């Protein structure tokens, strides 16, 4: 994840988690270790917390 400001707004956070959860539900491999069966949204949250989510946030100036 690459950003100019390291703090995400709640809207950016929701968008990232939703987009990544959709990818995971469509068959994308999770980038964090999963010990139990988790919901795609929970997996996406875990990826965001560990900062391994493969998505970028671009903000217009």
From Swiss-Prot:
Name of the protein in its database record: DNA-directed RNA polymerase subunit Rpo6
Signal peptide start-end: none
Keywords of the record: Cytoplasm, DNA-directed RNA polymerase, Nucleotidyltransferase, Transcription, Transferase
GO cellular component, one term: cytoplasm
InterPro entries noted in UniProt: DNA-dir_RNA_polK_14-18kDa_CS, Pol_omega/Rpo6/RPB6, RPB6/omega-like_sf, Rpo6/Rpb6
Function: DNA-dependent RNA polymerase (RNAP) catalyzes the transcription of DNA into RNA using the four ribonucleoside triphosphates as substrates.
Molecular function GO terms recorded: DNA binding; DNA-directed RNA polymerase activity
SUPFAM superfamilies reported in the protein's UniProt record: RPB6/omega subunit-like (SSF63562)
Biological-process GO terms, alphabetical: transcription by RNA polymerase I; transcription by RNA polymerase II; tRNA transcription by RNA polymerase III
Enzyme Commission no: 2.7.7.6
PROSITE patterns named in the record: RNA_POL_K_14KD (PS01111)
Reactions it catalyzes: RNA(n) + a ribonucleoside 5'-triphosphate = RNA(n+1) + diphosphate
Residues passing through the membrane, by range: none
Family matches, as NCBIfam families: PRK01099.1-3 (NF002208)
Name of the gene this protein is made from: rpo6
Organism encoding this protein: Methanothermobacter thermautotrophicus (strain ATCC 29096 / DSM 1053 / JCM 10044 / NBRC 100330 / Delta H)
Family per record: Belongs to the archaeal Rpo6/eukaryotic RPB6 RNA polymerase subunit family.
Cysteine pairings via disulfide bonds: none
Tagged with keyword Nucleotidyltransferase: yes
Subcellular location: Cytoplasm
Subunit: Part of the RNA polymerase complex.
Keyword Transcription in annotation: yes
